[in-house]
């Protein structure tokens, strides 16, 4: 396998389970954390940003594995579409690690939504008080077909999230996600939506 082109890594410190937010009998992990960091490495470039207090949800669903990081001012949601629909979100209590190979993924922040047909692996590692979430993405997405570029035959865009005005997320840390999504040549889902509405 070739060297990974993109890595998105979260370190969420002083994490503890949030029982009030957990759904019974659901394959999910819900935690709150005091602070954290997000590091992104793309083709030899690296950037790291601090995250304030927030929450994290990791949930296995029929449409893939969802990872949501919400720090109020800083928000990002990921959906990883796995290679095996029967995969379960089961924490390995002995190894304190969970791995989820995926074939494609979708990312949404407060100001940008994108999808990618690149494969990779998501790993989640638990320690006594820290959660490490790492998405390692290999290769480049396939070139778009002319039909898909105009929204013909393309999957519908992921649902948008309710978010405040643009001024709230035009900060350096929020700009990082936009920069990375463009750098790894993703197809903005918002662009798909605009073209579909205009057609």
UniProtKB/Swiss-Prot annotation:
Chief subcellular location equals: host cell
Is Lipid metabolism one of the keywords UniProt gives this record? no
Q: What is the effect of changing residue 107 to I?
A: In strain: Nonneuroinvasive mutant HF10
Q: Name one GO cellular component term.
A: host cell nucleus
What name goes with this protein? Nuclear protein UL4
**Matching Pfam families:** Herpes_UL4 (PF03277)
Q: Which domain of life is it from?
A: Viruses
Q: Which UniProt keywords apply?
A: Host nucleus
